[in-house]
Amino acid sequence: MRGAEQAGWQVLTDGREWHASPLPLPADPAAWYQLAAVGGWQAVLADTAHSVPNDVLSSRYDGSRGQTRGWYDLPYSVPVLCAAATADGVQALQRTAMTLHAEGIPLQRSVAVLVATADGRSPGAVRAAATVLTSQAGAVLTVPHDPHIRAHGLRNPAKLSQRGQQAAASLAQAVLTVAGKAWGDPLPPARRPAAFPLVISQGGNRP
């Protein structure tokens, strides 16, 4: 999270061990938008996990809005769709792209990320799928394998590999570029909640 007048970033975390189960966080995307407004943060990175195709199809079946559409409906949001850089991973990402397109959800306002699961060059099927997705999504990137993240998360960003840091910078720039194409550059300042008037009660007897 980053404030409009802050030079650095702030991290809101529970401080638990990397292998601990995640906290039960609110599923409604609007809750994260309200949190950003209350904190006065200009940019917020919310790390969530749900199966996009299953969510979209389930919401169509039961007539609900669904988490995926909720994220896309938020002002100035750029969803980052992640999948493993494997044959199964790109197939899942392709199914996601087709599902979003069928539901009229703007895939071009998304960034697709293929995460390498091992060192070395990505398989040919992965590279071919990434080429096809480039014409559909706002941007397609590949994040190299970094065993430090797998073992320790982001507790010490200074220990990330140089390739990993470059990939993170490229991802951040891709998100900003997609946002700029959708809403203009520069983006408007983050919304702030209206201040409540201070009411001081004086006198009177309590029942």
What feature does the model see in each segment?
Residues M1-G63, A151-K159:
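P-loop/Walker-type NTP enzyme "switch/lid" segment
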Residues G39-G40, V56-A87:
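Inter-motif core of Ras-like GTPase G domains
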Residues A43-D47, V80-C82, V113:
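Structural motif
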Residues H50-P53, Y76-Q94, D119-R121:
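Conserved Switch II/interswitch segment of TRAFAC-class P-loop GTPases
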Residues R65, G70-Y72, V90, Q94-S110, ...:
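Conserved C-terminal guanine-recognition region of P-loop GTPase G domains, centered on the G4
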Residues L74-P79, I105-S110, Q136-G138:
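Short glycine-/polar-rich loops that comprise or flank the Walker A/P-loop
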Residues A116-Q162:
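Beta-strand-loop-alpha "switch" segments that mediate conformational coupling across diverse proteins
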Residues R155-P207:
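NTP-binding/hydrolysis catalytic cores, primarily Walker-type P-loop NTPases
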